[in-house]
């Protein structure tokens, strides 16, 4: 660990540029999946433990399309549409039945959904790690110390464009306004004539489509495997818990922070500590909020 610290900050400080860039590229993808989770959590009060599995499904959708000769970027709209329909089906079969129940019911339901999706993907694609070749070149800087795969740059642009489109949709469209109204007060939304069931169905389907986009980007940048979903679920929960519901700038900022934390944890302590870093961030945020809550209670008393 000390040798890695010395390498990072003394012998080759230019490697920090690599860490910062990778954190940005990773954070952009995390932000998409995390925003989808924040949307479902904030509007429907459903903690979707299958969030990461939706991401992996999107990745396997791109992988399947490449097998028939379609470039993964051109597979994006197809994967979005398929995942949107899939989200509607899951809502009708599973989520609709647990919305008004206790929080633990939704946790158990989505946990069961996660296990089911993992096994289905395992049966179809096998347990092997898969990747999608995007055929983009890799740029180098600082005499090769910093590498910038162009697919990561393109993924950053696509993630930013998609996030911008979602924000515009939520602010300008009638459905977006209905979603925001339902998130604030479902009963008042019903009084105003908003079909909250339709809003819930659309919200969950939109979340699935967002995860599908994130999954395509993940497949092009890293690797996918049927049981990797839990990794992305942990990350999205850490981001949303830290940023708060309905806070898109906070989700984006926390996604970048988590991306940087993972990169530095990996280079300093080893790759096996990257996911552990996300878990420690989650534990730290929960502990800090518990301390703040206790202080507020003491002030009230």
Task: Show which residues each predicted segment covers.
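Membrane-interfacial amphipathic/re-entrant helices at transmembrane-helix boundaries
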Residues: 1-32, 61, 72-75, 101-106, ...
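Alpha-helical transmembrane segments within multi-pass membrane transporters and channels
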Residues: 37, 70-113, 120, 253-258
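Pore- or pathway-lining transmembrane helices of multi-pass membrane proteins that form conduits
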Residues: 53-57, 98-122, 229-241, 269-289
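Membrane-embedded helix boundary and interhelical linker motif in transport proteins
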Residues: 21, 43-89, 93
């Amino acid at each position: 660990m000390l040798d890695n610290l010395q390498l990072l900050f003394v012998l080759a400080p230019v490697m920090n540029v690599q860490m910062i860039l990778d954190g940005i590229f990773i954070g952009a993808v995390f932000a998409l999946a995390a925003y989808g989770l924040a949307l479902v959590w904030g509007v429907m009060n459903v903690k979707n433990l299958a969030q990461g599995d939706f991401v992996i499904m999107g990745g396997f959708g791109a992988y399947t399309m490449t097998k028939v000769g379609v470039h993964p970027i051109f597979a994006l709209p197809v994967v979005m549409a398929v995942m949107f329909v899939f989200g509607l089906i899951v809502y009708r079969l599973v989520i609709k039945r647990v919305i008004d129940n206790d929080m633990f019911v939704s946790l158990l339901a989505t946990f069961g959904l996660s296990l089911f999706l993992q096994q289905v993907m395992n049966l179809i694609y096998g347990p092997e790690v898969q990747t999608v070749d995007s055929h983009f070149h890799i740029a180098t800087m600082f005499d090769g110390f910093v590498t910038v795969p162009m697919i990561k740059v393109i993924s950053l642009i696509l993630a930013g464009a998609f996030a911008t489109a979602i924000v515009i949709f939520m602010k300008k469209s009638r459905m977006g306004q209905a979603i925001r109204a339902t998130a604030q007060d479902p009963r008042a939304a019903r009084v105003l004539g908003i079909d909250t069931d339709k809003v819930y169905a659309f919200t969950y389907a939109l979340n699935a489509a967002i995860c599908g986009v994130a999954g395509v980007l993940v497949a092009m940048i890293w690797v996918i495997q049927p049981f990797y979903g839990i990794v992305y679920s942990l990350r999205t929960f850490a981001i949303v818990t830290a940023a708060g519901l309905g806070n898109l700038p906070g989700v984006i900022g926390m996604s970048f922070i988590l991306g940087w934390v993972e990169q530095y944890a990996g280079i300093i302590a080893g790759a096996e500590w990257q996911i552990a870093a996300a878990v420690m961030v989650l534990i730290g945020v929960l502990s800090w909020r518990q301390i703040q809550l206790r202080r507020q209670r003491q002030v009230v008393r």
